[in-house]
Structures are given as C-alpha cells and as structure tokens.
Amino acid sequence: MTFDDITGDGRLWAVRYDDANDNELFRLFDQWNDVMWLRKFFKENINDLNAYFKITDINQAISDTIDDSEVLEGVILDISPEADLDLIFRPLSNNRTIAEMLEKMKARGERTNRHDSWLRIYAIRLADGKYIITGGAIKLTATMQERPHTQAELDKIEKVRRFLLDEGIVDDDGFIDYISEL
C-alpha cells in the first residue's frame, strides 16, 4: 500500500491499496457519483434503506447520495490551511473514553432536511489534525458489523493500522519519516 497526500501539506492522506487504480478518497467519490453502481447497491440493500431511513424510492436514494457526496467532497477537498480536520473527523466508536494511538475515526455527510447522511469516510488519526483515509461506505444499519460491505471497511481500517504499527509508525513524525524514506 502507498499513501497519497490529499491536501499537499501532510494533514490529510489517503491509502492507495496495492490492487487499486486510485486512492480510497477519490475511489469513494467516483463510486458515490456512479448512478449504475448506486442503483445496484440500493437494490441489494433496499430493506436496510427502508428499515432505518424509511426510504423505498431508489431514485430518491441515488439523488440524495449524489447530493450528499458533492457536499462531503467539497468539505474534504476544499480544506484551507487554517481548517481544523478535527472538526470533520470523529472517533469511530461512539463509546470512546480516551484517545488511543492511531485511533480509528469517521467523517460523515451532513444531515439533510430529509434524513441523516449515510455516507461515511473512515480514517486513522496520526496526530491532532492529521489523518489517513482508509476507505468509506454507505452505512444503512446501526452497526458496521451487520453488513459485509461495512465489515470490510472495519477490516481495512484495522489492516492499515496494523501496517503502520508493523512499520513502527505510531504518530505523525513516524509517518513522515516513513514517507520520506520511500
């Protein structure tokens, strides 16, 4: 795996997995704007969409996803040097009590007038205001373990965390040293 510097200043990175054509952030935004991919996804997950969000119209779900993706993409990619990424990313676990080394984090789209956002971007926190994006998903259930596509995102974030630890990377300084040696 390699890492792409999204902001150009080392504050936001995205994983590019060995078998991937692009990094995870750009892959997600491409996917969340692909009507055919979204139609297939929502057809396969219509029961979850209805159970949690009370939406049965796949076209509405597609439209909401594309709209929400554009807003989230603007927030993530239009980050000014003064912007605080800690306001965008939150701990993955809603029950976290203390910060941990290489903490698992999430960013989500904003609530619309119709419903909460189901878009998630997952990341690892290197230090205050510095993150590595590991993936993302359309989350239609209460927990990530309930569906294979969100469980896969948990697996990816843990895989990246393990990779960093195996390379002796426990913070931003270690990550920058690692990147500079490549």
Positions of PLM-derived features:
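Short conserved catalytic/interaction loops centered on acidic-Pro-aromatic/His motifs
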Residues: 132-135, 142-143
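Alpha-helix capping at helix-to-loop junctions
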Residues: 81, 128-129, 166
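An acidic, glycine-rich, mixed-charge low-complexity segment common to nucleic-acid enzymes
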Residues: 1-76, 83-109, 169, 175-176, ...
